[in-house]
Amino acid sequence: MEGKIISVNGPVVDIYFPNDVPHIYEALEVENPIKNEKLVLETRILFGENKVRAIALGSTEGISRGLTVKRTFHPISVPVSEEILGRVVNVFGEPIDGGEKIRGEVTPIIKNAAEFRRVQPSYSILETGIKAIDLLTPFPQGGKIGLFGGAGVGKTVLIMELIHNVAVAHGGISVFAGIGERSREGNELWLEMKESGVLSKAALVFGQMNEPPGVRMRVPLTALTIAEYFRDYLGKDVLLLMDNIFRYVQAGMEVSSMLGRIPSAVGYQPTLITELGEVEERILSTDTGSITAVQAVYVPADDLTDPAPATIFSHLDSTLVLSRSIAEMGIYPAVDPLASSSQILEPKFVGYEHAEVARKVVEILQHYESLKDIISILGVEELSEEDRIIVNRARKIQMFLSQPLFVASAYTNIPGVYVPREKTIEGFKAIIEGEVDDLPEDAFYMVGTLEDVKKKAEEHGALMY
């Protein structure tokens, strides 16, 4: 079953098939005579008499009209087995780390989500060891979590910290999808995981910035297929990390434009909701295991109402918003406690004490936010005694939400800290109840637990009796 190329326009290739026409999403193969390698195409549109329009998942340099295209009769497929752990692969499951070819059951990357009757919602908490997350936006195991932020506010660093903390502390399987991000960052992550000894329990799938849009659009599906294998066949709880899901949307926008579809709001593809649903709805907890997905989401121009972040929001269980104004204060991770949220921050899931402490922390920060205009005009001295206490505690809460990260210790020279959830609750409870009103603000900056705060205050000789 062969066809002939009749047109090449960048990554878009039109092919004529005299007999049977390929199915939508079927993978096609053409031999590149200049590079002596196989180029994979994906069927996207059937048009005219026996013609198809396909998107190339590689460079079309050397591809010309008249070349023979072969059908494969299946979608893009990848080999899945335990051999993929510790390896770095591309969208086709081929090694790009210089290692041996991966053997395993060849599985199509385009498929339906798990059957409705197999879905089992999970409400257990995935402890991250990061105070701002564990207190205000607890992650549900088997849930979907989004890290929202503009350029340079720390999304990738936080993703790498989560890999370090969750993979090291919990020892589970991790699958990382590098979608349209910098190749340098992918290389750094690979070396970091090698050094920390977690690479043997992780699979990395890369389709970076220099790849064609067809590849960037399929990398999340390859990573999901690998994660589903560990969940469904080996009964594992899998941590799936995607950096950056916005680049998946961008790739879809490029493909949509090349296929001649009329764009919708702000130039996005008209199929934006459908395309995101195809990825997000496959991230599920089932009767055999779970997939917990942490997704970095780039926010264009720091605008959370942009159609891409706004559509992604609707799929998530926890949303972590990183703020540029907080990053400018030197507080890292730059989590915005008032914009972030979690569906499981309720007493029945996290316990009464945790929910109550989190509520009071947010209440104090909201009160402080409402006083900022008065402070900037009249100064703190003009506030009532009660308001001054609120401001004092709010500033300490802000400082205490900062934390030294393991993956950033090489740059900050401050060793990273893993803070258990109980210690996090204990520390913030002490602040809101006024137990540490006599300690200076500086003592709360870039420390782990309440003990570290007291130790830092003593070292600076600032403890007041």
Curated annotation (Swiss-Prot):
It is a peripheral membrane protein. Its EC number is 7.1.2.2. It is an enzyme of class 7 (translocase). Keywords: ATP synthesis, ATP-binding, Cell inner membrane, Cell membrane, CF(1), Hydrogen ion transport, Ion transport, Membrane, Nucleotide-binding, Translocase, Transport. InterPro entries: AAA+_ATPase (IPR003593), ATP-synt_VA_C (IPR055190), ATP_synth_F1_bsu (IPR005722), ATPase_a/bsu_AS (IPR020003), ATPase_alpha/beta_chains (IPR050053), ATPase_F1/V1/A1_a/bsu_N (IPR004100), ATPase_F1/V1/A1_a/bsu_N_sf (IPR036121), ATPase_F1/V1/A1_a/bsu_nucl-bd (IPR000194). The keyword Nucleotide-binding applies. Disulfide bonds: none annotated. F-type ATPases have 2 components, CF(1) - the catalytic core - and CF(0) - the membrane proton channel. CF(1) has five subunits: alpha(3), beta(3), gamma(1), delta(1), epsilon(1). CF(0) has three main subunits: a(1), b(2) and c(9-12). The alpha and beta chains form an alternating ring which encloses part of the gamma chain. CF(1) is attached to CF(0) by a central stalk formed by the gamma and epsilon chains, while a peripheral stalk is formed by the delta and b chains. Produces ATP from ADP in the presence of a proton gradient across the membrane. The catalytic sites are hosted primarily by the beta subunits. This is ATP synthase subunit beta. The gene is atpD.
